[in-house]
């Protein structure tokens, strides 16, 4: 039995994660659109902005073909798209402004010949794991950036939001409501702090209600006239 057969379809997983985003948006008194910046998602995933909008609106993500030859062509085209995206969006600072890196600069930094880099950008060659890793390091993106399908890339982004960023944001909002002026929340390597934050949120919500209830009761008592 292939374990992949028991994994939720990418479209269903994206929908589930978006439901979680909606729940946090309601808690924070905002909207999904305010929490999900299309430009930031595009920059972080390598998916073009228009396609990001489509995926967030429920369009099904493109999946890797099962047939071997079709799968190899798909991976080659995907790598080309991601590499071109990086060359276009990860720019170097120059006196004239921000400019894309040239083939020779990429070649010198990665040890991959300029001709081979050109072939990768044109989709004429596929990249092996070593070349992909060197290029991802050069452009300062996570491992797998150039090979993840759009569904996998968006799922990874949304999971980080739901499991890390939004729990921090929600906890910070509750603590500030409780009167904490400065709240510093840092993630740890094993994610233990984030799990703790998610577990604490319901208790913090109850604490806010208790304090607000006491404040409301005190205000009513103070407003009564003494006999």
Model-derived regions: residue spans:
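A short, Lys/Arg-rich alpha-helix, primarily the initiator
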Residues: 1-34, 39, 50-103
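Short, basic-rich loop-to-helix N-cap that marks the start of a DNA-contacting helix
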Residues: 31-40, 100, 124-137
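Residues within the helices of the helix-turn-helix
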Residues: 39, 103-108, 115, 133
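Alpha-helical residues within the helix-turn-helix
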Residues: 43, 108, 137
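Short coil turns linking two alpha-helices in DNA-binding domains
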Residues: 48, 102, 113-116, 128, ...
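Short C-terminal boundary/hinge segments that cap the last helix of small helical domains
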Residues: 49-55, 140-157
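Interfacial/linker helices and their anchor residues that mediate assembly or domain coupling
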Residues: 154-227
């Amino acid at each position: 039995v292939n374990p992949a057969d028991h994994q939720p379809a990418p479209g269903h997983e994206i929908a589930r994660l978006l439901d979680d985003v909606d729940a946090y948006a309601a808690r924070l008194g905002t909207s999904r659109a305010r929490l999900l910046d299309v430009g930031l998602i595009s920059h972080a995933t390598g998916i073009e902005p228009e396609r990001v909008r489509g995926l967030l609106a429920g369009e099904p993500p493109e999946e890797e073909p099962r047939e071997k030859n079709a799968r190899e062509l798909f991976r080659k085209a995907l790598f080309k798209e991601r590499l071109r995206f990086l060359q276009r969006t990860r720019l170097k600072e120059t006196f004239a402004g921000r400019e894309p890196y040239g083939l020779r600069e990429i070649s010198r930094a990665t040890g991959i010949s300029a001709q081979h880099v050109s072939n990768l950008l044109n989709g004429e060659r596929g990249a092996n794991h070593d070349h992909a890793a060197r290029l991802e390091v050069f452009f300062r993106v996570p491992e797998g950036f150039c090979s993840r399908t759009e569904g996998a890339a968006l799922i990874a982004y949304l999971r980080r939001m739901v499991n890390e960023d939004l729990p921090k944001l929600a906890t910070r909002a509750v603590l500030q409501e409780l009167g904490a002026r400065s709240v510093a929340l840092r993630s740890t390597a094993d994610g233990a702090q984030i799990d703790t934050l998610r577990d604490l949120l319901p208790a913090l919500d109850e604490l806010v209600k208790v304090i607000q209830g006491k404040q409301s009761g005190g205000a009513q008592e103070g407003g009564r006239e003494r006999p």
